[in-house]
């Protein structure tokens, strides 16, 4: 920590930066348990978001991120630009939101075996969502959960013919039916 220079910054900012660096080091040290190994967590979770045409997607995504984080998962959001932007604007201080990436980039990284996840939650309100869920089931080792919603959710559920856990409800503007269906499955439980 010594020897750092803070050109053009006041003393208060310097001391805050040094305090923050020391605090981060302390927190990293706390992550090591008695055996010297980092603590185990349930793992990582990918949330796949498509076009945010149906209003419930953003609120359910934030709710799911919160539940996953409380259970020890590290959630990552992969969506199109509109879906990602809605989440970033809804949570500007990143209280819930962590890593956010482009959906096509996430698919490429998983396909190239550069990254994978333990759980994958695909938000579905149209045929494209079903295609993404099938793709994730084929390229990833993750356990796939499909969140099917919208006016015609029942027709979409009938099209799912690949292994996954289906969470479905008629939810367009009111997220509570989908939240209830999600809570019944508790996909964040280890």
Q: Language model features by range: what are they?
A:
Residues 6-45, 57:
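Short N-terminal or domain-adjacent regulatory/targeting segments
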Residues 81-102:
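N-terminal beta-loop-helix "entrance" segment that forms/cooperates
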Residues 96-120:
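Helix-adjacent hinge/juxtasegments
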Residues 128, 136-190:
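Glycine-rich, aromatic-bearing surface loops/beta-hairpins
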Residues 115-135:
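Mid-chain, well-packed structural core segment of small domains
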Residues 74-80, 146-150:
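Short internal beta-strands
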Residues 49-51, 121-127, 147-150:
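Structural motif
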Residues 58-70:
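Histidine-anchored nucleotide/phosphate-binding helix
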């Amino acid at each position: 920590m010594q020897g750092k220079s803070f050109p053009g910054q006041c003393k208060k900012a310097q001391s805050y930066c040094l305090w923050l660096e020391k605090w981060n080091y302390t927190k990293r040290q706390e992550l090591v348990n008695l055996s010297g190994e980092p603590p185990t967590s349930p793992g990582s979770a990918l949330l796949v978001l498509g076009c945010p045409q149906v209003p419930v997607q953003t609120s359910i995504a934030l709710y799911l991120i919160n539940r996953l984080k409380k259970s020890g998962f590290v959630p990552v959001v992969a969506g199109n630009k509109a879906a990602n932007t809605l989440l970033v604007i809804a949570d500007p201080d990143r209280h819930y939101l962590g890593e956010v990436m482009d959906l096509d980039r996430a698919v490429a990284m998983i396909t190239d075996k550069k990254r994978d996840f333990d759980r994958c939650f695909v938000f579905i309100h149209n045929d494209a969502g079903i295609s993404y869920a099938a793709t994730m089931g084929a390229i990833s080792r993750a356990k796939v959960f499909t969140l099917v919603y919208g006016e015609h959710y029942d027709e979409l559920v009938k099209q799912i013919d690949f292994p996954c856990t289906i969470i479905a409800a008629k939810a367009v503007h009111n997220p509570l039916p989908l939240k209830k269906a999600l809570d019944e499955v508790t996909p964040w439980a280890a």
